[in-house]
Amino acid sequence: MSGPADSIEIQNVVASTGIGQELDLEALADDLPGADFNPDNFPGLVYRTQDPKAAALIFRSGKIVCTGAKSIDDVHDALGIIFDKLRELKIPVDDEPEITVQNIVSSADLGHNLNLNALAIGLGLEDVEYEPEQFPGLVYRMDEPKVVILLFGSGKIVITGGKRTDDAETAVEEIVERIDALGLLG
Amino acid sequence: RLRKWQERIRTKDAGERNLQFALSEIDRMASALGVPRSVREVASVIYRRALNEDLIRGRSIEGVATSALYAACRQEGIPRSLDEVAEVSRVPQKEIGRTYRYISQELGLELKPVDPKQFVPRFASALDLSEEVQAKATEIIDVSAEQGLLSGKSPTGFAAAAIYAASLLCNEKKTQREVADVAQVTEVTIRNRYQEQIEAMGFR
DNA sequence: GCTTTAAAAAGTAACGT
DNA sequence: ACGTTACTTTTCAAAGC
């Protein structure tokens, strides 16, 4: 059975962690090749890993935000690289810092074009934001799982706000069911 | 106790002044947009409801007033684009859109998506186009919307393309630039929507 | 609320050629 | 009239203004 759920692709994973140690970002900016640090602009130092491709925001408190990774494994790999780089610089890093996934962005394809006008009314104007003058996607806030889904006329969708890998799958099954019940799924 | 009394009066006066300012701003912007008095009244009601439900806290009075007017135009079936509303407001378009979404949600306005057909009479008359062109543009919008071409597209661009196509079909040709100017969209957008609509109509 | 980072979706806009 | 780049929307953490 190949359905919309099989078309789900994780596009971005955001996670947070901490090394349990305060950092001197000025010194770190000098010691870490490729680091971007503009304290006037933003308090975090930006460091990008190449493989896996990800970007980390490193803060004075030792807390770190990792974003841009394509999977949870990639988040762990990217942060592992960063932890090792810090240890190389003689900065004490906790043995296994706890990594918390904060947000997962996925895309999927429902396989049919969507009439967004009919969908806005069918799904309930109170739960829908559809302002094509400002953005071509219909914004649907789902309570369970608690995610936000962007639906497009092409049938392509974006699921964001989930913290678990299977939130996207559950959400896609749910939205397909709701659209189908309205008779709006081609 | 006297101080408390004075503060109440001060707060009440400040509130009155703010309300008066908001209502006069709605009036000023409505005049500039050329919307009828009934729409200004609807906008005033929306503003007062937002005020009563404490939706203005953390937002600018002008932003809420502008959004109330934008919402009122839609509710009354004579929408103005965010661009048009932003032109007569001192609030940036982005804030108007954000504030509109907020008050619309909180007040449960439940306004349907803007229908491109609602822009046809105003745009067409600004271009001195006949009743016949308007009817044709309306037909083009209906036919292409039924074929699913409207999803995700800007209502103003969709209306502009239909008017351009109708002006050609009725031998009252307007250039893409002329139509683009009144609808405040680019010629590129008109061209793109026009091509799809002509195909939907079975021409080509 | 803002600042920064990443990513997808599709439409619109503004460049330069 | 191309092509490219960039902006719109959503989500989330971080520290500080």
From Swiss-Prot, chain A:
UniProt-listed InterPro entries: TBP, TBP_archaea, TBP_CS, TBP_dom_sf
Protein origin, superkingdom: Archaea
Hydrolase listed as a keyword: no
GO terms of biological process kind: DNA-templated transcription initiation
Molecular function terms, GO-annotated: DNA binding; DNA-binding transcription factor activity
Keyword Cytoplasm included in the entry's annotation: no
Described function: General factor that plays a role in the activation of archaeal genes transcribed by RNA polymerase. Binds specifically to the TATA box promoter element which lies close to the position of transcription initiation.
Keywords: DNA-binding, Isopeptide bond, Repeat, Transcription, Transcription regulation, Ubl conjugation
Organism, as annotated: Haloferax volcanii (strain ATCC 29605 / DSM 3757 / JCM 8879 / NBRC 14742 / NCIMB 2012 / VKM B-1768 / DS2) (Halobacterium volcanii)
One Pfam family matching this protein: TBP
First and last residues of every Sequence repeat: 10-86, 101-179
Protein name: TATA-box-binding protein 2
Family: Belongs to the TBP family.
Covalent cross-link Glycyl lysine isopeptide (Lys-Gly) (interchain with G-Cter in SAMP2) as placed by the record, residue numbers: 53, 63
